[in-house]
């Protein structure tokens, strides 16, 4: 039997859905490498950025280089001992830290590489500063593709993740927002984020992932939270080969119900690209449009939103998809013909902004999905009334998260004005040039 993926409707945007987007990117992020043969390649963030710039999306949004997260900021979630270890360990002195390496699970999947701590601080800084800008009403959507490292634990690296930037970003959002919703569309379960907020009703976590003999082995249907957090963790365990139409038929009703009943005042969306068809480590069959539909759907609720990266191990497909999704966040449906960019040869032989589904068999039967949905909605019945939060004095903003002054930005160049000032200029929709 040959399985044919159902064609997906073209994605559309409404003029009324225009949002102010703050995009965080650090040019150094692509310089870091986990090591030869390791599937995680930070270079994909640089490839996505190159596409985003060459499509002209820089005219539509403000671009920032976030301050790297400090030790003090990282320790809002992680233990001092663990962060201290990350800041001191290098490939040269690894022998001295043998005991700690075992304790903190740093080794095979999470190797020590040159610049490890700096890489973590870039990832954490983007998510924390994005959250701070949302808190102050400076933007409606914050984007940090260097973030999304959802497996990292309080004092342990896991699944290519060392610093859990998502948890740090959510902690920042909780200073202003009574309820935060976290949605995860990575093929792997968002275990680190779920674990961090498993006992609270102030954060609802919702993860759509492959379950069954697959890393990290958590995220089954009956994991719903404990104590005050009971029913505030939602897990949607899926099987191999899920296609666009099937994914949409699960994603949209679940998110709609959560939005209706939980009424979050901010949402964090982890856009792991390993749920795309043809991923080196994934086993789903989503096209670029199927993945992007999730972003567009969450955006349509008009709630302050932070978008972070995550997994994704076929670099050309991750870059294409994140670029297309950045367009949607800016209310633009990008043209399929790729503009010339410095990584153009990666996108052959078609050179199109497209990730097509394969003829992979969809193991997710309607009966299985009905059972999953019935279970989830039964649990959500218990969250019908959004939990309230006691009024508290909001602590002063961290000085490190203040706006960058132009004086401290990069030196002025030949065109007059600084690059920083031009990055903040957003072109009006009616401009002709």
Swiss-Prot record:
<dbReference type="GO" id="GO:0016239">
    <property type="term" value="P:positive regulation of macroautophagy"/>
</dbReference>
<protein>
    <recommendedName>
        <fullName>Histone deacetylase RPD3</fullName>
        <ecNumber>3.5.1.98</ecNumber>
    </recommendedName>
</protein>
<keyword id="KW-0804">Transcription</keyword>
<dbReference type="GO" id="GO:0051321">
    <property type="term" value="P:meiotic cell cycle"/>
</dbReference>
<dbReference type="GO" id="GO:0000086">
    <property type="term" value="P:G2/M transition of mitotic cell cycle"/>
</dbReference>
<dbReference type="GO" id="GO:0034399">
    <property type="term" value="C:nuclear periphery"/>
</dbReference>
<dbReference type="GO" id="GO:0000118">
    <property type="term" value="C:histone deacetylase complex"/>
</dbReference>
<dbReference type="InterPro" id="IPR050284">
    <property type="entry name" value="HDAC_PDAC"/>
</dbReference>
<dbReference type="InterPro" id="IPR037138">
    <property type="entry name" value="His_deacetylse_dom_sf"/>
</dbReference>
<keyword id="KW-0805">Transcription regulation</keyword>
<dbReference type="GO" id="GO:0033698">
    <property type="term" value="C:Rpd3L complex"/>
</dbReference>
<feature type="modified residue" description="Phosphoserine">
    <location>
        <position position="408"/>
    </location>
</feature>
<dbReference type="GO" id="GO:0070550">
    <property type="term" value="P:rDNA chromatin condensation"/>
</dbReference>
<feature type="modified residue" description="Phosphothreonine">
    <location>
        <position position="394"/>
    </location>
</feature>
<dbReference type="GO" id="GO:0044804">
    <property type="term" value="P:nucleophagy"/>
</dbReference>
<dbReference type="GO" id="GO:0045128">
    <property type="term" value="P:negative regulation of reciprocal meiotic recombination"/>
</dbReference>
<dbReference type="GO" id="GO:0005737">
    <property type="term" value="C:cytoplasm"/>
</dbReference>
<dbReference type="GO" id="GO:0032221">
    <property type="term" value="C:Rpd3S complex"/>
</dbReference>
<feature type="short sequence motif" description="ESA1-RPD3 motif">
    <location>
        <begin position="320"/>
        <end position="340"/>
    </location>
</feature>
<dbReference type="InterPro" id="IPR003084">
    <property type="entry name" value="His_deacetylse_1"/>
</dbReference>
<dbReference type="GO" id="GO:0030174">
    <property type="term" value="P:regulation of DNA-templated DNA replication initiation"/>
</dbReference>
<dbReference type="GO" id="GO:0141221">
    <property type="term" value="F:histone deacetylase activity, hydrolytic mechanism"/>
</dbReference>
<feature type="active site">
    <location>
        <position position="151"/>
    </location>
</feature>
<dbReference type="GO" id="GO:0070210">
    <property type="term" value="C:Rpd3L-Expanded complex"/>
</dbReference>
<comment type="subunit">
    <text>Component of the RPD3C(L) complex composed of at least ASH1, CTI6, DEP1, PHO23, RPD3, RXT2, RXT3, SAP30, SDS3, SIN3, UME1 and UME6. Component of the RPD3C(S) complex composed of at least EAF3, RCO1, RPD3, SIN3, and UME1. Interacts with cyclophilins CPR1, CPR6 and CPR7, with the kinase HOG1, and with ESS1, CYC8 and HAC1.</text>
</comment>
<keyword id="KW-0378">Hydrolase</keyword>
<comment type="function">
    <text>Catalytic component of the RPD3 histone deacetylase (HDAC) complexes RPD3C(L) and RPD3C(S) responsible for the deacetylation of lysine residues on the N-terminal part of the core histones (H2A, H2B, H3 and H4). Histone deacetylation plays an important role in transcriptional regulation, cell cycle progression, DNA damage response, osmotic stress response and developmental events. Is involved in rDNA and telomere silencing and in double strand breaks repair.</text>
</comment>
<dbReference type="GO" id="GO:0034605">
    <property type="term" value="P:cellular response to heat"/>
</dbReference>
<dbReference type="GO" id="GO:0045944">
    <property type="term" value="P:positive regulation of transcription by RNA polymerase II"/>
</dbReference>
<keyword id="KW-0597">Phosphoprotein</keyword>
<dbReference type="GO" id="GO:0031507">
    <property type="term" value="P:heterochromatin formation"/>
</dbReference>
<dbReference type="InterPro" id="IPR023696">
    <property type="entry name" value="Ureohydrolase_dom_sf"/>
</dbReference>
<dbReference type="GO" id="GO:0006357">
    <property type="term" value="P:regulation of transcription by RNA polymerase II"/>
</dbReference>
<keyword id="KW-0156">Chromatin regulator</keyword>
<dbReference type="GO" id="GO:0004407">
    <property type="term" value="F:histone deacetylase activity"/>
</dbReference>
<keyword id="KW-0963">Cytoplasm</keyword>
<dbReference type="GO" id="GO:0006334">
    <property type="term" value="P:nucleosome assembly"/>
</dbReference>
<keyword id="KW-0539">Nucleus</keyword>
<feature type="region of interest" description="Disordered">
    <location>
        <begin position="388"/>
        <end position="433"/>
    </location>
</feature>
<dbReference type="GO" id="GO:0070822">
    <property type="term" value="C:Sin3-type complex"/>
</dbReference>
<dbReference type="GO" id="GO:0006995">
    <property type="term" value="P:cellular response to nitrogen starvation"/>
</dbReference>
<dbReference type="GO" id="GO:0016479">
    <property type="term" value="P:negative regulation of transcription by RNA polymerase I"/>
</dbReference>
């Amino acid at each position: 039997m040959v399985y044919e993926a159902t064609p997906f409707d073209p994605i559309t945007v409404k003029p009324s859905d225009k949002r102010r987007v703050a995009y965080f990117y650090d040019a150094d992020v692509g310089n870091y490498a986990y090591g030869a043969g390791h599937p995680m390649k930070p270079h994909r963030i640089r490839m996505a950025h190159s596409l985003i710039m060459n499509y002209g999306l820089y005219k539509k949004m403000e671009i920032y280089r976030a301050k790297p997260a400090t030790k003090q900021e990282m320790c809002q979630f992680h233990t001092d001992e663990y962060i201290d270890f990350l800041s001191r360990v290098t490939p040269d002195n690894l022998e001295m830290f043998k005991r700690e390496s075992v304790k903190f699970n740093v080794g095979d999947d999470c190797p020590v590489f040159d610049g490890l701590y700096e890489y973590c601080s870039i990832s954490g800084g983007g998510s924390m500063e994005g959250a701070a800008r949302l808190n102050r009403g400076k933007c409606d959507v914050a984007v940090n593709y260097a973030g999304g490292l959802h497996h990292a634990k309080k004092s342990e690296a896991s699944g290519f993740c060392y610093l859990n930037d998502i948890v740090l970003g959510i902690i920042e959002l909780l200073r202003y927002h009574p309820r935060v919703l976290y949605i995860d569309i990575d093929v792997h379960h968002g275990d680190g984020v779920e674990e961090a907020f498993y006992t609270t009703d102030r954060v609802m976590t919702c993860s759509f992932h492959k379950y069954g003999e697959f890393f990290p082995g958590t995220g089954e249907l009956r994991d719903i939270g404990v104590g005050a957090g009971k029913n505030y963790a939602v897990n949607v365990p899926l099987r191999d080969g899920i296609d666009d139409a099937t994914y949409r038929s699960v994603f949209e009703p679940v998110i709609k119900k959560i939005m209706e009943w939980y009424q979050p005042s901010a949402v964090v969306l982890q856009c792991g690209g390993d749920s795309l068809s043809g991923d080196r480590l994934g086993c789903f069959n989503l096209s670029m449009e199927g993945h992007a539909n999730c972003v567009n759907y969450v955006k349509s609720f008009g709630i302050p939103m932070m978008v972070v990266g995550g997994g994704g191990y076929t670099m050309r497909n991750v870059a294409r998809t994140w670029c297309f999704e950045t367009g949607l966040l800016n209310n633009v449906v990008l043209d399929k013909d790729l503009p010339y960019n410095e990584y153009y040869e990666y996108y052959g032989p078609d050179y199109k902004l497209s990730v097509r589904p394969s003829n992979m068999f969809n193991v997710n039967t309607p009966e299985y999905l009905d059972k999953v949905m019935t279970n989830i909605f039964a649990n959500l019945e218990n969250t019908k009334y959004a939990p309230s939060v006691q009024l508290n004095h909001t602590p002063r903003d961290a000085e490190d998260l203040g706006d960058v002054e132009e004086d401290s930005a990069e030196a002025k160049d030949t065109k007059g004005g600084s690059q920083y000032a031009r990055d903040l200029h957003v072109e009006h929709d009616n401009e002709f040039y």
